[in-house]
């Protein structure tokens, strides 16, 4: 059975707690989109855990956790997160944690670009409230085909991978030097970084799509864990104040690598009052439009608010359920 858990506001709805409860009866928990811009908080007898990349099910010893195809993975952050929870007595091994070979690597320059661009925008008062963890830049380079996937770490000795690395680095050095006046990065340093990540994570990398498909066919209980909420969805959120991935439940099987499967259950999580991390309008402000008042002087934000009000939260909820 497949259950998808997603947020139907701006994130921070409490999905981590819900998934932790569902994981008690699950065999597998899968994150299918986003990166380490998530912040799922779970409190157990072992302490308080704030999980940015690891699925919430990692705290359950009999649950297998997967970072699937639709993810962008900051491997340095993941290494630190694994070390942190191991220090609290949580086991993380290739038997209970798997990385998709198709997941995108968040390269070292993605965080640098994100930080520099957010600083530049902040000087003009138009910053997006980015987490500065390189998520947008990792997804951008995914669609430009100018980054690596985790499976590429298996083939760093292959000439075609080395040529791709050199080509990527040349382009990034032009961007960083031309736009932000940064010192160029060297190819030997980049290759050494990739080799270091490969040494640590090769045992975890596999065809997770095949693994999940086989597990479902054998009757395993699976939970899909979304990051953020519908109002941060790249297509259905309040653009441009969105994340860079598809957060709704309908994308869950695609991002998980099992695109032919439909969730048996969809759990939409919300809380009684609205909060969000980052810049952009909150849904309650749309009430001002009904009273003829202008909640914000910026036309772009007004347009986004009107579009959101017209679409309606009900439409987003139908999208989550796959009935729209």
Where are these regions (language model features)?
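Non-transmembrane, aqueous-exposed alpha-helical and coiled segments at domain scale
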Residues: 1-324
């Amino acid at each position: 059975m497949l259950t998808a858990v997603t947020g139907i506001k701006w994130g921070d709805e409490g999905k981590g707690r819900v998934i932790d409860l569902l994981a008690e009866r699950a065999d597998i928990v899968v994150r299918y989109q986003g990166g380490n811009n998530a912040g799922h908080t779970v409190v157990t007898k072992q302490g308080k855990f704030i999980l940015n990349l690891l699925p919430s099910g990692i705290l359950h010893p009999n649950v297998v956790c997967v970072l699937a195809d639709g993810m962008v993975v900051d491997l340095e952050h993941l290494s630190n997160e694994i070390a942190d929870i191991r220090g609290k007595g949580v086991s993380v091994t290739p038997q209970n944690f798997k990385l998709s070979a198709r997941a995108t690597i968040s390269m070292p320059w993605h965080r640098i670009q994100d930080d520099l661009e957010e600083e530049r925008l902040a000087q003009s008062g138009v910053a997006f409230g980015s987490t500065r963890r390189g998520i947008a830049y990792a997804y951008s380079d995914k669609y430009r085909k100018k980054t690596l996937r985790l499976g590429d770490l298996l083939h760093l000795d292959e000439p075609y991978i080395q040529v791709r690395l050199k080509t990527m680095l040349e382009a990034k050095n032009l961007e960083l030097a031309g736009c932000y006046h940064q010192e160029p990065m060297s190819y030997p340093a980049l290759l050494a970084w990739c080799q270091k990540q490969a040494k640590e994570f090769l045992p975890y990398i596999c065809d997770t799509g095949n693994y999940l498909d086989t597990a479902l066919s054998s009757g395993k209980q699976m939970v899909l864990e979304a990051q953020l909420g519908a109002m941060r969805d790249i297509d259905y959120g309040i653009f441009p104040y969105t994340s860079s991935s598809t957060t709704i439940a309908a994308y869950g099987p695609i991002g998980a690598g099992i695109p032919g499967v439909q969730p048996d259950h969809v759990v939409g999580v919300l809380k009684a009052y609205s909060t969000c991390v980052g810049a952009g309008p909150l849904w309650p402000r749309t009430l001002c439009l009904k009273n003829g008042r202008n909640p914000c002087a910026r036309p772009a934000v007004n347009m986004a608010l009107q579009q959101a009000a017209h679409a309606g939260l009900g439409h987003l909820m139908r999208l989550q359920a796959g009935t729209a």
